Amino acid sequence: MQWTPEHAQWAEQHFDISSTTRSLAHKAEAYRGHLQRTYQYAWANDDISALTASNLLKKYAEKYSGILEGPSERALLCSYSESAPGLLNGRKSESDAWQEGIYPMSCAADVISASKTGMTPALPPPDVTASVGSSTGVASSLSEPSYSSSNCGNHASALHSGIPSQEFASSYNGSYLHSTYSGGQSTPALPSPHPSPLHSAGLLQPPPPPPPTLVPSYNTSSPNLSSYNYPPAGYPPQTPVAPGYSPGGAPPPSAYLPSGIAAPTPLPPSTIPGYSYQSHNHAPIAPTPLNGSSANTLKRKAFYMTGQGDMDSSYGNFNYSQQRSAQSPMYRMPDNSLVDSTRGNGFDRNADTSSLAFKPTKQSMPTDQQRKFGSQAGRALTPPSYGSSKGSLGSMRSGESFGKFGSPVMSDHGDDSRQHLPHSIDTATSSSHPAEEQLKNSDANLVEMVTTEILQQTSPVDWSDIAGLEMAKATIKDEVLWPILRPDMFSGLATLPRSILLFGPQGTGRTLLGRCMASQLGAAFLLLSGSALVTKWLGEGEKIVQASFLIARCRQPSVVFISDVDLLLSSQLSEESPVNRIKSELLLQLDGVLSSPEEHVLVVCSTSKPEEIDESLRRYFVKRLLVPLPDATARHQIISQLLSQHNYCLSDKEVTLLVQRTDGFSGLDVVRLCQEALVGPLHGMPGADLSGMIPGQMRPVSYQDFENVFCKIQPSISQKELDTYTEWNKMFGCSQ
């Protein structure tokens, strides 16, 4: 450890404190040296933690106050009763009586004359008082004699109630702040013609001007403020008391900050009123760090920095992943949003636009870039609030929140360029009104059922969560998501993709792809089951389809996923079939989505029997993508992921053998195989042993457990079905 001049002070200060011959003033000076040279120096240089600094401050403050109130060669004059100091620090006070009675002071007349001349206008009422020793760290709960903040006539102020008081009321904010800081205009205090005993004893010195550097204020409205406060570390110079400490107003001085460190910008004043106490002629001390915050946060953080380094994605700045939800500034609307914070999807609209990775506000661009983008305009997407109340469905105007899916780039002449935009914000806003009105007039029970059972509230899905399917994922990114996210870059397309058909074997991850698309767009996800519509909800299936699309329009952007769509669009349906009503309603909604490009609704349909869909209805799906069986890499990823969550003893060679033996398995088949093998160690165990066993005592999963399961689970997809998918994809598919 390096020897510094501060270490040389320890021995001298310890002798000054422990010596029995030293005066109280000398001991107090030694304690002040402890605070100034050791505690403040160590805390400012991060040599000690915030908790250690707080404990040291409490220790020194108690000893310091004990010296000031303890017995000395000069007995105190009736400062307290016999019991009060004993309760505080265990020391008795041998006080003497006052040598003379109460007498008036000339400063009272000066105060009256000063108030008449208007030198101190708008003074608070004189009933707010505090005692000299009323620090919360000394005796905040005891009844003490009341003294004025003025240094003259203090002992007579209580009896001369008829004289207008010159006491300055203050809102005491829980820790010693600088006396000149006030929420309003500061009124200078009158000088005292009679110095107080503290001044005459040399403990207080003439006040210098206040320090110019400020730090964030700590007020009583903060729930994290330390619950105890301490007497001041000393009585260094300060200015006279100004009228009124504003709660959460101007912050204390930054005397405790190390030199060379810029002071943070003061926080705005709090609107919560504080408690009024009389002001003190004490010096400010370093405030205790907030609970849960480090000292570096208070001393060195000048402003809040929004971390964006971890926001990596394949979309760069155009990522709308729901994984970051409301905490990320990427989803917060600008302050000039068309919808106030009480409407829309419920996300915070007060984010600083300078910290947005995908800026939704107007941006100045060079002239060449303006020509390049052609004055295209757009708004940033905001993911839906899955926790929003059901009753707010009818009151949402999502078109106001989201001008369009696309580009955030706006020219400087944004208002003039709106008339040239194919899908303006105003058009999207007006188009959402009919959906709102229809939803308000719908059956409340039906809307609640759709909200609870069809509107999904699941965790977001990333591309890395889907094993394999690289061709399908690349096609969705390039031909579906990017045209929606950047319509200005795909202006050559006749129509943007608004409906997709995913076909392929069962259990290959089509629904997972739909969830991932919703996550990447930051959109609400509605899952309609075709099999449930033709069985469970056959009687009111068309109403459910209509309500689902109405909610999707009110919660734009949204993704409507319809599984087993071949049951609804089959060419073998008879005219008398009740499914025809559901089919007609679905086609009506698809026509509305395809004919309204300003609506931000993406329809994703899924089927394992694409050949059964009516040929005339294939035109409704702009993109038709094959989702094949997982390849060897995808099967290895699935097996490794499932085994990593359990105790197993398989070598790499055995895992590779499992991957080879699962050729032809769907993703769901591989999952079922692993699940059956993971419970293999439990088979054949007696019931008594199983009841007393804990999970850690179960033997690891071995290759033999998988061997036993292979005889039970076979591929669920036949080669004939695979050939059918291949042929249909060659004729009508759009992906490979």
UniProtKB/Swiss-Prot annotation:
Residue positions binding ATP: 467, 507-512
Q: Where would you find this protein in the cell?
A: Nucleus matrix; Cytoplasm, Cytoskeleton, Microtubule organizing center, Centrosome
* Amino acid composition bias (Pro residues), ranges on this chain: 205-214
Leader sequence segment: none
For molecular function, the Gene Ontology terms on record are: ATP binding; ATP hydrolysis activity; microtubule severing ATPase activity
CC terms in the record's Gene Ontology section: centrosome; cytoplasm; microtubule; nuclear matrix
Q: Where is the composition biased (Polar residues)?
A: 352-368
Q: Which UniProt keywords apply?
A: ATP-binding, Cell cycle, Cell division, Cytoplasm, Cytoskeleton, Microtubule, Mitosis, Nucleotide-binding, Nucleus
Q: Residue ranges under compositional bias (Low complexity)?
A: 128-150, 216-232
Q: Where is this region: Disordered?
A: 118-155, 180-248, 272-295, 341-438
Function of the protein? ATP-dependent microtubule severing protein. Severs microtubules along their length and depolymerizes their ends, primarily the minus-end, suppressing microtubule growth from and attachment to centrosomes. Microtubule severing may promote rapid reorganization of cellular microtubule arrays and the release of microtubules from the centrosome following nucleation. Microtubule release from the mitotic spindle poles may allow depolymerization of the microtubule end proximal to the spindle pole, leading to poleward microtubule flux and poleward motion of chromosome.
Q: Which PANTHER family match?
A: AAA DOMAIN-CONTAINING, FIDGETIN
Q: What is this protein called?
A: Fidgetin
